[in-house]
């Protein structure tokens, strides 16, 4: 059972799919709230995540590491949104913060676990 959980957490494809959910959410935010110019940030990140899904290995880990670093810079704001219930001027999100923030933190964990597994060569894709 523990190995099944570790295999799930260290699978780069699972991490890429979780990141894709975040990208799709941000595409919605671009059209609904921020404006289409926000896609200038979102689409390249989506491209990195898609490339990591298909490439795998150490190159895939490096591709996935770039959005993960961006997520880590946002962690203080994420924690602030969880503790205060306000999401930095995005008050229209409201209670959705309590759904989005844990998912985002889980995605960061998935990213880190899969990056380590791919970099070490211990993932299930290491021999393929």
Regions inferred by a protein language model and the residue ranges of each:
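Loop-to-transmembrane helix junctions at the membrane interface
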Residues: 48-79
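Cytosolic juxtamembrane helix and N-cap/initiation of the first transmembrane helix
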Residues: 1-21, 110, 117-120, 124
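Interfacial non-cytosolic loop connecting adjacent transmembrane helices
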Residues: 34-39, 72-101
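Alpha-helical membrane-associated segments of multi-pass integral membrane proteins
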Residues: 26, 87-128
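Membrane-embedded alpha-helical transmembrane segments of multi-pass integral membrane proteins
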Residues: 22-25, 43-47, 67-74, 106, ...
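Membrane-embedded alpha-helical segments in integral membrane proteins
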Residues: 17-31
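Short, aromatic-rich membrane-interface segments at the entry and exit
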Residues: 33-42, 59-64
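Short, amphipathic, aromatic/basic-enriched membrane-interface segments that mark the entry/exit
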Residues: 6-12, 28-39
């Amino acid at each position: 059972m523990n190995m099944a959980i570790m295999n799930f957490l260290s699978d780069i494809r699972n991490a890429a799919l979780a990141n894709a959910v975040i990208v799709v959410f941000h595409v919605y935010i671009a059209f609904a709230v921020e404006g289409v110019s926000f896609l200038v940030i979102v689409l390249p990140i989506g491209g990195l995540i898609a490339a990591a899904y298909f490439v795998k290995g150490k190159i895939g880990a490096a591709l996935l590491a770039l959005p993960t670093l961006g997520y880590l810079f946002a962690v203080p704001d994420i924690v602030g949104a969880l503790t205060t219930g306000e999401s930095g001027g995005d008050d229209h999100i409201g209670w959705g913060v309590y759904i989005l923030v844990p998912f985002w933190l889980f995605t960061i964990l998935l990213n880190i676990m899969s990056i380590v597994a791919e970099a070490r060569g211990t993932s299930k894709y290491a021999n393929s």
